[in-house]
Amino acid sequence: MCVLLVLIVASSYMLAPKDNTAEGGIVNPNANGFFSEPKDSIDIAVVGNSDAYSGFSPLELWNEYGYTSYVSAEGHQTVAQSYSQLKKIMKCHSVKLIILETDGFFTRSKLVESTAKLINASMGSAFSVFQYHDRWKRVKPNELLKAPNYTAHCTAKGQWLSNEVKGYMGGEYMVKTDKREEIPFSTKTSLDMLVKMCAENDIKLLFLELPSQSSWSYKRHNAVKDYADEKGITFLDLNIDRESFGFDWKTDTRDGGNHLNSRGARKATLFIGKYLSENYPLSDHRGDNRFKQWNADYKEYLEKVKI
């Protein structure tokens, strides 16, 4: 058993990407750009699926409130995979708040597949050979014992910027009901692990649902609220009372109601930022010279966002 453990640890070090670029072998460089941020500089970690990286803007949050955040989200990211990403982030940063986008709670997969994802996510963060076991086909001999050197800088801090406008012209989808859509057992298992991890590390946890006409409903809202209430977690659902932050489905989505564009992300993030400023003791870093790169990144962000 000891020999096997040594082999796993050694293989994990040798096969793990030594840079957080696509060329370095990392999966999804945008989601892993936090490796390149100065140590302990990220206060808020945002995880979830494509709704999160489309609808949350770290640089809008920075400009308005001086909070530092990173969106480590991926398409179809499960809660188990969110847990894995958070374990990695916590090795680099002293996170004060975790924002978990809840759309991924309802990503369904076969029991065997979901169990495998949970095991891979929980073990992969500690033993990367489970995540990068196929990398031996591409890794170069001089990379095997090389120390990690993360160089990829994601200006948008994990956000997917989009100037596309394709509005949703349909009817109201948030029709109030007492019904609930069941959260899969595998998701609840992963959620319990994530909630426990936050409690053990004294990290605040916020459940967030960004506007999504095609994937959200009142039945899902009720199910998440039940779990959140049971665990004593705040749940912020931006699909309800959208008018309070000026959201407009005709102008604020890039694909007809599934994901937000950059205009929608700005509106949603400023609303979230106001809520955070009133409910969490987060630090405003705008006057700190150690964070001057954020000002440069914000200027570059403004050049890319046209809506």
Question: What residue ranges belong to the model's regions?
Answer:
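Conserved, well-ordered alpha-helix/loop/beta-strand core segments that scaffold catalytic motifs
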Residues: 97-108, 158-245
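Membrane/wall-proximal cationic-aromatic binding patches
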Residues: 2-68, 78-88
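Second-shell loop/turn segments in exported
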Residues: 46, 71-75, 178-184, 209-214, ...
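Extracytoplasmic/secreted proteins, especially bacterial periplasmic and envelope-associated proteins
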Residues: 56, 60, 81-84, 122-131, ...
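Histidine-centered active-site loop/cap adjacent to the catalytic His
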Residues: 253-290
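Membrane-embedded segments
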Residues: 47, 51-130
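Secreted/periplasmic serine-hydrolase-like ester/acetyl group-modifying domain
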Residues: 113-204, 285-307
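Accessory, usually C-terminal, subdomains that scaffold auxiliary metal cofactors
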Residues: 240-258
